[in-house]
From Swiss-Prot:
Annotated catalytic residues: E278
Cofactor binding remark: Binds 1 Mn(2+) ion per subunit.
Residues at which substrate binds: F97, A98, T99, G100, N101, F102, A188, V189, N190, H210, A211, W212, W213
Broad class of the protein's primary localization: Golgi
Positions in coiled-coil regions: none
Transmembrane segments: 7-26
Protein name: N-acetyllactosaminide alpha-1,3-galactosyltransferase-like 1
Sites where a glycan is attached: N89, N101
Length: 319
C-alpha cells in the first residue's frame, strides 16, 4: 500500500514538473523557433552588394573604414531586403523613455509618427518606459502594432536619469524583450518620423551619425578627453561622432552596449568624474564598430540649414 502511494506521488510530481516546464519555457521555445528560422535562412541573406551601392552617392561618406554601409538616400534597395525579411516573419522592438514633460505631447507625437512610418508591414512592439503609466496619452495603433508600458523603477542614490533609464532597460531586455523581438531600437522621444524608416536599418548593431558633427572635423568632436574617464578617446583617434537619439541592433548587442555604459559610468562616478551617456556611447562604438551606420538623413535637426547632401529626411530632431 505504501509503495502504491509513493508511486502515485512520484507520477504526480513528474506530471507537475512537465507542466511547469511546458509553461515556463513556452515563451523561450517560441523565441528559439524564431531564431532557428532566421538561422536556417541565414545563408540566403542578401549580400551587401545586392542591395547597397555607395557609388551612387559620391558626394558623401557612404562606407566606413571597416566596410559597414552608411545609409543615405539612393544608396540602398529596400525591396531586395524586403524579400528576405518578409519570409522570416520578424518582430522589431522600439523602446522609448517618457519622463517628465516628455510623457504627454512629445510621446504622443513620437508614437503617432512611428506608427505611420516605422517598419511598415512588419510586426512591431512599442515599449514605453515612463515615470507613471497612469497618465500616458491614448494611442490608436495600426495593424501589426502592439504597445507595452512599464513604470520606471526608482533607484536609491541615483541622480543620473540616463543611468536609471539604462538600468531599467537592462532589466527589461533580460526579462522580456529578448524573447519577443529579433531587432531592437532605443530612441529619444523628442523626435518625429517624417518618412519611412525601413529594414535597411536592421543589423547586429546600429549607430546614428550626429547631424551637427558629421560636417565637422574629427579633431573637433566633443569626445571625452579626460584620460581618467572610462569614455576617454585620444585626440588623434575616432571615426565619427554618434548621436544618442537612435541606437539599435539585436537585443543582445543592445544589452551589451547598456552593460558597457553602466560599467563605464559607474567607474567614472567612483573616480568622481561626471560623464555623459553620449560620451560612453561614442567610446563603445569606437571599440565595437557598428554594422550599420545611419546618415544624418535619419535624424536631422530642422533648425539647421539643410545642405545638398541631405536628400530625404527620415526623422526630425527636436532638442
Amino acid at each position: 500500500m505504501q509503495y502504491k502511494k509513493e508511486a502515485l506521488l512520484l507520477m504526480l510530481f513528474a506530471v507537475l514538473l512537465a507542466l511547469t516546464q511546458r509553461f515556463s519555457y513556452s515563451r523561450t521555445k517560441d523565441h528559439l523557433q524564431k531564431m532557428y528560422a532566421c538561422w536556417k535562412d541565414h545563408l540566403e541573406e542578401p549580400h551587401l552588394s545586392t542591395w547597397f551601392d555607395p557609388k551612387k552617392r559620391p558626394d558623401v561618406i557612404a562606407t566606413t573604414g571597416w566596410l559597414a554601409p552608411v545609409l543615405w538616400e539612393g544608396t540602398y534597395n529596400r525591396e531586395v531586403l524586403e524579400q528576405y525579411y518578409k519570409r522570416l516573419n520578424i518582430t522589431i522592438g522600439l523602446a522609448v523613455f517618457a519622463t517628465g514633460n516628455f510623457s504627454k505631447e512629445p510621446l504622443r507625437r513620437f508614437i503617432k509618427s512611428a506608427d505611420k512610418y516605422f517598419m511598415v508591414g512588419y510586426n512591431v512592439i512599442f515599449y514605453i518606459l515612463a515615470d507613471s503609466t497612469y497618465n500616458l496619452p491614448y494611442f490608436e495603433l495600426g495593424p501589426l502594432r502592439t504597445l507595452k508600458t512599464w513604470r520606471l523603477f526608482e533607484e536609491e542614490m541615483c541622480q543620473d536619469c540616463n543611468l536609471r533609464n539604462m538600468n531599467n532597460m537592462h532589466s527589461k531586455i533580460i526579462q522580456c524583450i529578448q524573447y519577443e523581438v529579433n531587432f531592437l531600437f532605443m530612441m529619444a522621444v523628442n523626435q518625429t518620423f517624417k518618412n519611412n524608416f525601413g529594414v535597411e536599418t536592421l543589423g547586429k548593431s546600429v549607430a546614428q551619425l550626429h547631424a551637427w558633427w558629421y560636417f565637422k572635423k574629427p579633431r573637433d568632436f566633443p569626445y571625452e578627453r579626460r584620460t581618467k574617464s572610462a569614455a576617454f578617446i585620444p585626440f588623434e583617434k575616432g571615426d565619427f561622432y554618434y548621436h544618442r537619439a537612435i541606437v539599435g541592433g539585436t537585443p543582445l548587442n543592445v544589452l551589451n552596449l547598456i552593460e558597457q555604459y553602466i560599467k563605464g559610468i559607474t567607474d567614472d562616478n567612483t573616480n568622481k568624474l561626471v560623464s555623459t551617456f553620449e560620451s560612453h556611447l561614442n567610446k563603445y562604438f569606437f571599440i565595437n564598430k557598428p554594422a550599420r551606420v545611419l546618415s544624418p538623413e535619419y535624424n536631422w535637426d530642422p533648425r539647421f540649414k539643410t545642405p545638398p547632401e541631405i536628400k530625404h529626411i527620415k526623422i526630425a530632431w527636436k532638442p
